[in-house]
Amino acid sequence: MDQAKLARLQQSVRIGKGKGTPRRKTKKVHKSSGTDDKKLQTSLKKLNVQPIQAIEEVNMFKEDGNVIHFAAPKVHASVPSNTFAIYGNGEDKELTELVPGILNQLGPDSLASLRKLAESYQSMQKGEGGEDAKKDDDDDDDEIPDLVEGENFESKVE
């Protein structure tokens, strides 16, 4: 072979240089919550759930003492399959935020946690009240002299 032919062949061979084949774009599938809701709806239809009307609020009590509170939710139920579906925006709230209107909904476990909360608040208030009382007493003591037998402080005050 001729050296000139070899040089031309070497230049024509592309290894790592040039564009080559274009990169293939993959189609990204975005999974939306709408598809999840549709799947949930179809599985609930299989259970033959019925909507329950006139429910003002739903409260779910957690073990840590907090409550998941749903205001004006949509509720569907299937009593034979013991399935309840609650739709709406749930908010995590502390038990103390809902206390006046929630007392009739509390079970024995929740009542125990409510008692614990009440006791902890009382102990905190007593601790703060005791410290405040001591501080107030110390402030008042600066103006009042200590009583010592045999001395008359009336002349010093005037």
From Swiss-Prot:
Belongs to the NAC-beta family. Residues 16-31 have a biased composition (Basic residues). Keywords: Cytoplasm, Nucleus, Protein transport, Repressor, Transcription, Transcription regulation, Transport. Residues 137-152 have a biased composition (Acidic residues). It is found in: Cytoplasm; Nucleus. InterPro entries: BTF3, NAC_A/B_dom_sf, Nas_poly-pep-assoc_cplx_dom. This is Nascent polypeptide-associated complex subunit beta. The keyword Ligase does not apply. Disulfide bonds: none annotated. The keyword Transcription applies. One of its GO terms (biological process) is protein transport. Residues 1-40, 119-158 are annotated as: Disordered. GO terms for cellular component: cytoplasm; nucleus. Residues 34-99 form the NAC-A/B domain. It holds the Pfam family NAC. It comes from Ajellomyces capsulatus (strain NAm1 / WU24) (Darling's disease fungus). Part of the nascent polypeptide-associated complex (NAC), consisting of EGD2 and EGD1. NAC associates with ribosomes via EGD1. Component of the nascent polypeptide-associated complex (NAC), a dynamic component of the ribosomal exit tunnel, protecting the emerging polypeptides from interaction with other cytoplasmic proteins to ensure appropriate nascent protein targeting. The NAC complex also promotes mitochondrial protein import by enhancing productive ribosome interactions with the outer mitochondrial membrane and blocks the inappropriate interaction of ribosomes translating non-secretory nascent polypeptides with translocation sites in the membrane of the endoplasmic reticulum.
